Regions:
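Transmembrane alpha-helical segments that form the functional core of multipass membrane systems
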Residues: 1-7, 22-26, 39-48
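Membrane-interfacial helix-loop connectors
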Residues: 15, 29-86
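Soluble N-terminal domains of membrane-associated systems
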Residues: 215-223
């Protein structure tokens, strides 16, 4: 039932509303990942391939995933150098290159605020709209089966595929940096880092104090 409903909504968005529909579809894909309902889309893709020989959803999937990677890189740029947040953001970006967005979503883009996630969804929408305008279609499912390159027209489509993904990757980074400068929404990142720093200092002070007490006890025993 969920699959049939999703199939109807996707068909209307992509085929009836053009680039705007593709924007909405791409922007909403990763929220579906958060809820777990995205699994139903695999059946829709299989049906598209069986009936038409092509899969326009794969390109939308691609931009929605790499956009979350862009969000993680945006958080990487905002984090303090050599901090744990910076390491986590970079390590969560890498899986998006092979089609896995969950680490970027939960470890970076939703950690301090919903804004990075929203910026990533908007970036995905921009990439999805471009994919629709460029007419990019896949011949299979999954990240490894994008489009054929046997003739000149599909080689051009491959270039469009890459451009669409670059758009989806860059837009979230730009939006996150601009939003942070204007709204300071990521002040929580700095507060968290300050708290971690204060905790480290406190632990160091306690350790030093314990060592001093131990030294004093040893001196007393010798006396």
């Amino acid at each position: 039932m969920i699959g049939n409903g999703l199939a109807a909504v996707i068909d209307v968005l992509y085929n009836s509303f053009g680039a705007f529909g593709a924007f909405v579809f791409a922007a909403l894909l990763q929220p579906l990942v958060v809820t777990g309902t995205h699994q139903a889309i695999q059946g829709i893709e299989a049906n598209l391939i069986a009936t038409t020989g092509f899969n326009y959803i794969q390109g939308i999937w691609s931009v929605s995933i790499i956009a979350q990677g862009g969000g993680a890189i945006g958080m990487y740029l905002l984090a303090k150098k050599h901090s744990k947040d910076r390491d986590i953001a970079m390590s969560s970006f890498i899986p998006t290159l092979v089609g896995i967005s969950e680490p970027a979503i939960f470890a970076a883009n939703l950690k301090y605020s919903v804004i990075p996630f929203v910026c990533s969804c908007l970036g995905a929408g921009c990439g999805g709209a471009f994919m629709k305008l460029a007419g990019v279609r896949a011949i299979g499912q999954g990240i490894n089966r994008n489009i054929r390159t046997s003739d000149r027209s599909t080689k051009i489509k491959l270039v469009f595929y890459v451009i669409g993904n670059l758009i989806a990757f860059i837009v979230p980074i730009v939006l996150i940096v601009i939003y942070n400068k204007n709204k300071k929404v990521f002040h929580m990142v700095k507060k968290e880092e300050e708290a971690e720093s204060a905790l480290t200092i406190d632990e160091t002070a306690k350790s030093t104090s314990q060592k001093q007490l131990l030294t004093e006890k040893l001196l007393r025993l010798k006396m």
